[in-house]
């Protein structure tokens, strides 16, 4: 049975006991409203560790002033049942006061330069600063051997890996594959914001990513591929933030060179819902 923990001292006691037994510990950080994509991360963690802690914390410092912090879906009972079903050992539910004892305005903040400034960083200033700050705190609270993050938030994964290297956290970072609906739409907690009419339209993002990958692998000029992707998404009713081809480290590729490993990334709005997705190749 899953152990739900809200006290930091108790969490540290549990983890210390596991350590005394020589057990490996994994952390799966989440913001709740969990779906099959999240649960796949827990199952991946179980392959690499003896015990799994999953945190649920809707982190206020990674939301911008006009984003959906207040209305972000919170489903604690369903989250607990789902985590228990996939073998999570501890559900860590910290309060805002536990995570930010001095308040969110006075807290120490972490920032990873360069990779945090592009793509999502352009459209969501301060987002990765909030992500790095809360993830570093979770690392210090749980002291895991391994931590698992979803590849749907690909830039977040790259940023966290850089932070771990720069700050010498002795933690292995794993990326879990994107879990998709039957029509290719990447599973996301924000999909529930889509109307019945918008839901079929949303799958066009994945089809566009496939077209981008195929065009690049056939020798297409990256700027042309990106421009066509924007046209395609706009024709499907999206307001596009970006549709780009990048190297796997998010560096910009050189035209005329077929890159592998590479990645196509899209962020676009359908009505009031902002969706992100990517496709590695």
UniProtKB/Swiss-Prot annotation:
Catalysed reaction, written as an equation:
(R)-pantoate + beta-alanine + ATP = (R)-pantothenate + AMP + diphosphate + H(+)
Please tell me where ATP binds in this chain: 31-38, 150-153, 179, 187-190
The Gene Ontology biological process terms listed for this entry are: pantothenate biosynthetic process
Q: Which family does it belong to?
A: Belongs to the pantothenate synthetase family.
Please tell me where this protein is predominantly located: cytoplasm
A cellular component term from Gene Ontology for this protein is: cytosol
| Taxonomic superkingdom | Bacteria
EC primary class:
ligase
This chain's protein is named Pantothenate synthetase
The residues that the entry says bind (R)-pantoate are 62, 156
Q: Which SUPFAM superfamilies match?
A: Nucleotidylyl transferase
Location in the cell: Cytoplasm
What the protein does comes down to:
Catalyzes the condensation of pantoate with beta-alanine in an ATP-dependent reaction via a pantoyl-adenylate intermediate.
- Listed binding positions for beta-alanine are 62
- The answer to whether keyword ATP-binding applies is yes
Subunit notes for this chain? Homodimer.
- What keywords is this UniProt entry annotated with? ATP-binding, Cytoplasm, Ligase, Nucleotide-binding, Pantothenate biosynthesis
Keyword Cytoplasm listed: yes
């Amino acid at each position: 049975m899953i152990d739900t923990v809200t006290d930091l001292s108790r969490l540290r006691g549990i983890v210390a006991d596991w350590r005394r037994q020589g057990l490996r510990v994994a952390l799966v950080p989440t913001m709740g409203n969990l779906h099959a994509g999240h649960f796949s991360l827990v199952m991946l963690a179980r392959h690499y560790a003896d015990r799994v802690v999953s945190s649920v914390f809707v982190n206020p410092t990674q939301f911008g002033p006009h984003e959906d912090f207040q209305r972000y879906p919170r489903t604690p009972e369903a989250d607990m049942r789902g985590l228990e079903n996939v073998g999570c050992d501890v559900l860590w539910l910290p309060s805002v006061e536990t995570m930010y004892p001095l308040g969110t305005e006075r807290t120490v903040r972490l920032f990873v330069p360069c990779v945090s400034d592009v793509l999502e960083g352009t459209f969501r200033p301060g987002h990765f600063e909030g992500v790095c700050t809360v993830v570093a705190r979770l690392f210090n609270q749980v002291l895991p051997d391994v931590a698992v993050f979803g590849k749907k938030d690909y830039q977040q994964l790259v940023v966290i890996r850089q932070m771990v290297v720069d700050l010498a956290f002795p933690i292995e970072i794993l990326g879990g594959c994107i879990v998709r609906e039957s029509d290719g739409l990447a599973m996301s907690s924000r999909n529930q914001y889509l109307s019945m009419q918008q839901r079929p339209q949303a799958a066009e993002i994945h089809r566009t990513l496939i077209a981008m990958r195929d065009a690049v692998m056939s020798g297409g000029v990256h700027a042309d591929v990106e421009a066509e992707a924007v046209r395609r998404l706009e024709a499907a009713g999206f307001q596009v933030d970006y549709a780009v081809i990048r190297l796997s480290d998010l560096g910009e590729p050189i035209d005329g060179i077929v890159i592998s490993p590479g990645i196509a990334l899209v962020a676009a709005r359908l009505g009031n819902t902002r969706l992100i997705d990517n496709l590695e190749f």
